[in-house]
A protein has these predicted regions:
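Extreme N-terminal signal-anchor transmembrane helix of membrane signaling/transducer proteins, especially
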Residues: 2-37, 41, 292-297
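Juxtamembrane interface helices immediately C-terminal to a transmembrane segment
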Residues: 9, 27-57, 61, 78-86, ...
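Cytoplasm-proximal transmembrane signaling helix
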Residues: 13, 17, 209, 270-272, ...
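Extracytoplasmic/periplasmic sensory segments of membrane signal-transduction proteins
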Residues: 41-48, 57-154
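Solvent-exposed, extracytoplasmic
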Residues: 84-102, 182, 186-224
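Extracytoplasmic/periplasmic ligand-binding sensor regions of membrane-associated signaling proteins
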Residues: 99, 118-191, 196-199, 250-251
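Membrane-proximal, non-catalytic sensory/regulatory domains of signal-transducing membrane proteins
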Residues: 142-178, 204-208, 212-213, 231-267
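Short, hydrophobic beta-strand elements of compact beta-sandwich sensory domains
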Residues: 173, 185-192, 259-284
Length: 334
């Protein structure tokens, strides 16, 4: 009788386990899609946050430069058309503007290539501003910020570069100055990405921003800021993908499979988030593990419960069997 009880319990439990496994597989497939969708949504939001930070950074600096240009151009042309005039009427403004905006340097590149500048060198000399040019083997007319500002006749932002003094990523924002139709020069500010990097350090995810030359200048992961760090794998794919279109790539550094979402920023920069595939899939497999544990636990409990339930309901059969055996023994039909 015990054998019958056990067999009934095992058969019933086997049916229950098969049903649970089928249900678990179907549930896992739907849960996997739902969780992956939520993870992609979260990663996309990280990129959007990084994009907003970069756009705000650029907008602040552009607006500041344009405001200074308007202020300078309020002077009559005779107060702007020579180096002496610029030093006398504008030099102090460059220093005040630099201090207020915490810029690395603020300067006017004149048509002859000479600078009137407020920068760390003038600070070291304990003066508000100074000049820089031919005597220092420097000609502003050969520099990208000057050439592009004059050529486009509008505000120009250089690709990021490493500042020699601070060894930090830096941008130059420049705009041409014209007064009464006369070219005065190019107004420019050097901007460290210190404030932008501080913002990124508080952002979620492994987000970063790079320029057209694939140089990362702000990132939640500081290892990406190292000179020569190769992001070509993700950068090349980002160029052919739509904004916020998820994709996978292989990182050359270690051959690991990774997941990414990228978007263009201001038409010049690219913001991305890049995570290992394992990290993206981890929540999915965690759910699968929990489901497997539940099936195993439920199966064990089912065997025990079914055994006792079957035992209870098969007990009368044992009594009947005993009675019949005694009856046939009595009439000698054993």
């Amino acid at each position: 009788m015990k054998s019958v009880k056990l067999k009934v319990a095992l058969i019933a439990n086997l049916i229950a386990v098969v049903c649970l496994v089928i249900l678990g597989v179907i549930t896992f497939m739907f849960v996997k899609q739902a969780i992956f969708h939520e993870v992609v949504k979260a990663e996309t939001n990280y990129v959007k946050t990084a994009k907003n930070s970069m756009e705000s950074f650029k907008a602040r600096n552009s607006l500041a430069l344009e405001s200074l240009a308007k202020s300078i151009l309020k002077h009559p042309v005779e107060q702007l058309d020579s180096q002496d005039a610029l030093m006398r009427y504008v030099g102090k403004d460059l220093k005040n503007f630099r201090d207020a905006g915490r810029f690395l340097a603020v300067y006017i590149a004149q048509p002859n290539g000479e600078l009137v500048v407020s920068d760390p060198d003038s600070d070291a000399k304990k003066v508000d501003f100074g000049t820089y040019g031919k005597a220092d083997n420097y000609d502003a007319r050969t520099r990208e910020y000057y050439i592009e500002a004059v050529k486009t006749n509008k505000l120009y932002v250089t690709p990021s570069y490493i500042d020699a003094t601070t060894n930090l990523p830096c941008f130059t924002y420049s705009t041409p100055l014209y007064k009464d139709g006369k070219f005065i020069g190019v107004l420019a500010v050097d901007v460290l990405v210190t404030d932008l990097q501080a913002e990124f350090e508080n952002l979620p995810g492994r987000t970063f921003v790079f320029d057209e030359e694939n140089k990362v200048f702000a990132s939640t992961d500081k290892t990406l800021l190292q000179q020569g760090y190769d992001i070509s794998a993700i950068a090349n794919l980002a160029k052919i993908k739509e904004n916020f279109e998820p994709f996978e790539y292989t990182r050359p550094k270690d051959g690991s499979e990774r997941f990414a979402v990228c978007t263009k920023v201001s038409g010049v920069y690219t913001a991305c988030v890049g995570e290992p595939i394992e990290q993206i899939e981890a929540p999915v497999y965690k759910i699968a593990f929990i489901q497997t544990a539940i099936v195993i636990f439920t199966s064990i409990i089912s065997v025990i419960l079914l055994y006792f339930i079957v035992s209870k309901y098969l007990s009368p059969l044992a009594a009947i069997q005993t009675g019949l055996t005694s009856f046939f023994d009595f009439i000698n039909h054993k």
